[in-house]
Amino acid sequence: MTILAIDTSNYTLGIALVQETKVVAEYITYLKKNHSVRAMPAVHALLNDCDLKPEDISKIVVAKGPGSYTGVRIGVTLAKTLAWSLNVPISSVSSLEALAANGRYFNGLISPLFDARRGQVYTGLYEYKDGLLHPVLPDRNVLLTEWLGMLKEKGQQVLFLGHDTAIHDQTIQDILAHQAVMGDAALHNPRPSELAYLGAEKEAEDVHQLVPDYLRLAEAEAKWIESQK
């Protein structure tokens, strides 16, 4: 089975090809560039480098958000288009879960984090048990201070992952002190190969029903809904 994994949900663009237990190819960049013009060429380049054709793909896995509204839409739309045109199954994985997978060797709780502005973050809580990643608290859009208060009550060390941890480093350290473990730079990019393996275990979804998971409405959408009340 050849799995194609696609993640454009944040600044990180990640494409991977995985066959069973082997990572055949993986492409990762962290650039403030438009994924809409780079994602598909990256898929083609990876397939060509591996002497594979689109028809060799057995399954597609996509990061469904949260993250950048535009980025999430680009990845989900691309993945759905490929799955439909190639007639292969598709599965989606939380972008936070994919990032949390980088904490495989951490003995404690894992909090992947994306900045959501105005003191808020997209985050969730995970941990590894017997080599498998498990959710402890569901993904959410929450005030960082509120989230840190919840983590403080758990009394365990927490590994924070994601480039946006740098924005909130001082607040995290002030509230959690020794409980907080800041991930190394190499762990802040979500790995599309990890995304592929997470998705390999998930059931296939209806390609027409699969939608992004933003965790909150875009500001413009929220204002429009409020105006209709």
Regions found by a protein language model. Give the residues of each.
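Surface "functional belts" at beta-alpha junctions
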Residues: K22, N34, P89-H188, E219
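Residues at secondary-structure transition points
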Residues: Y30-P41, Y69, R73, T77, ...
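Short glycine-aspartate micro-motif
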Residues: I3-A5, V61, G71, I110-L113
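Acyltransferase
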Residues: V181-K229
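N-terminal beta-alpha supersecondary unit
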Residues: M1-P66
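DPxDG-like acidic metal-binding loop motif
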Residues: K59-I90, S95
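Conserved hydrophobic/aromatic positions in well-ordered beta-strands
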Residues: A16, Y122-Y126, D213
